[in-house]
Regions:
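Active-site entrance/lid segments in N-terminal catalytic domains of soluble metabolic enzymes
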Residues: 3-131
Length: 131
C-alpha cells in the first residue's frame, strides 16, 4: 500500500485528508467515525463570537430586566466556550489523530482568550476562521 503520511502545519498526518469544520465535526462520537473512516485530521466546527452574542441578544430581546444584560451575556459566553472546550477534550479522548480547533472573533481580546483556553483544552492546532 502507498504511504500517504505527510506533515501539515507541523502536525504529522497519516494522510492529507482532513475533515473540515462543519456541523458534522461538532460531535465527538462522529469524529471517531471520521477517524475510523481514515481521515488524517479533524477541524472542529468553528466557535463564533458573533453567534454567542446573537444568542445572548435573543435571550434578552423580550426581557423586562435590562440590568440582567451583563449577567446573561457573560453566562452565555462562558457556557458556549465551555461546551466547545468539552468538545475538544472528548474528541481528543476518543481520537488519536490531530484535532484542530477553529475560532472566529471580531474583538481582539476574545481571539486571545479563546485561543488560550483552546490550547489548555488540548487541541493540536488552531484554525483562525477569518472570513
Amino acid at each position: 500500500m502507498i504511504d500517504l503520511k505527510t506533515e501539515y502545519a507541523g502536525l504529522k498526518l497519516r494522510n492529507p485528508l482532513i475533515a473540515g469544520s462543519s456541523g458534522m465535526t461538532n460531535n465527538p462520537e462522529r469524529n471517531k467515525e471520521f477517524e475510523k473512516a481514515g481521515v488524517g485530521a479533524i477541524v472542529l466546527k468553528s466557535l463564533f463570537e458573533e453567534q454567542i452574542e446573537m444568542q445572548s441578544s435573543n435571550l434578552l430581546k423580550d426581557s423586562d430586566y435590562p440590568e440582567a444584560s451583563d449577567y446573561v451575556q457573560e453566562y452565555v459566553k462562558v457556557n458556549q466556550v465551555n461546551e466547545y472546550l468539552e468538545l475538544i477534550k472528548k474528541t481528543k479522548a476518543l481520537c488519536t489523530i490531530p484535532i484542530i480547533a477553529s475560532i472566529n472573533c471580531y474583538k481582539a481580546d476574545n481571539w486571545i482568550d479563546f485561543a488560550r483556553q483552546i490550547e489548555l483544552a488540548g487541541a493540536d492546532a488552531l484554525e483562525l476562521n477569518v472570513f
